[in-house]
Amino acid sequence: MLTLARQQQRQNIRWLLCLSVLMLLALLLSLCAGEQWISPGDWFTPRGELFVWQIRLPRTLAVLLVGAALAISGAVMQALFENPLAEPGLLGVSNGAGVGLIAAVLLGQGQLPNWALGLCAIAGALIITLILLRFARRHLSTSRLLLAGVALGIICSALMTWAIYFSTSVDLRQLMYWMMGGFGGVDWRQSWLMLALIPVLLWICCQSRPMNMLALGEISARQLGLPLWFWRNVLVAATGWMVGVSVALAGAIGFIGLVIPHILRLCGLTDHRVLLPGCALAGASAVLLADIVARLALAAAELPIGVVTATLGAPVFIWLLLKAGR
């Protein structure tokens, strides 16, 4: 038994090391690649200072943090709701952030600065989160709280559809770009949004013990002495914050929160002591690689990153499911 535990521990360490190396390689490639290839030896030249440190580095950091936040949000929701299909958009938090952003675009008539749009997106996500917490205070079961989130998501989606229908052509282009996701406008002015993600990410990665209890199911978690009501509120609030900030930075990026935790579990990473940091590393790497493809696939334009993540990730996910089912 001890030998099996040691083997599993070594395997977990190997996975984390491999994911760390993958993320570092993707980080290096992201800083080098672009319209002009700039090798590490040229990073401290005047050209490198402009392209690498002022343009590519803030974008790369934003991509890493958003990818980690979305993947960890998916892992938290899947444990909290005992549903492998749970992801950040399921509770309506992503759509709530979208409603806040769309309201800011339409009411501000395109004149609001980026920081104001970011605050509106975070406010929309937190409003939906507060509504969910109000439901949670009524001590609803996990399944009913999940259904309440789905209903809120449908309402927010309907509001966004109405807003797009009545928007002008200029607003429509901005809204459609947001709905497909992208990091094209990110620079150091959004550093406050990046800093807003880091404390919550680090805190959640340290909560493996309650997460492991939640993954056992609601009844087992209560029997083990976990204050379920408290942890449900805290985790829903933390997820709402991360999703709101991510939407403010990059718009709507689907698929990552659903697939990354699922793929890691299929690879044997079921303990949240390993799964949570693994999701952060894998999510950051996946979104960063997708962002590189989005930048380089077309010479004259940039692809929406949400389309790239779905196109590249869906076949891999299907293959892993088929492989696991054999």
From Swiss-Prot:
Keywords for this protein: Cell inner membrane, Cell membrane, Membrane, Transmembrane, Transmembrane helix, Transport
Note whether Cell membrane occurs among the keywords: yes
* Cleaved signal peptide residues: none
Q: Which GO terms describe its biological process?
A: cobalamin transport
Q: Which GO terms describe its molecular function?
A: vitamin transmembrane transporter activity
Question: What main location does UniProt list?
Answer: membrane
Q: What Pfam family is a match, any one?
A: FecCD
Its membrane topology is listed as: Multi-pass membrane protein
The entry's localization annotation reads: Cell inner membrane
Chain segments annotated as coiled-coil in the UniProt record: none
Q: How does it assemble?
A: The complex is composed of two ATP-binding proteins (BtuD), two transmembrane proteins (BtuC) and a solute-binding protein (BtuF).
Biological function? Part of the ABC transporter complex BtuCDF involved in vitamin B12 import. Involved in the translocation of the substrate across the membrane.
What family is reported? Answer: Belongs to the binding-protein-dependent transport system permease family. FecCD subfamily.
PANTHER family in UniProt: FERRIC ENTEROBACTIN TRANSPORT SYSTEM PERMEASE PROTEIN, VITAMIN B12 IMPORT SYSTEM PERMEASE PROTEIN BTUC
> What HAMAP family does the annotation carry?
BtuC
Protein name per UniProt: Vitamin B12 import system permease protein BtuC
Supply the source organism for this entry. Answer: Shigella sonnei (strain Ss046)
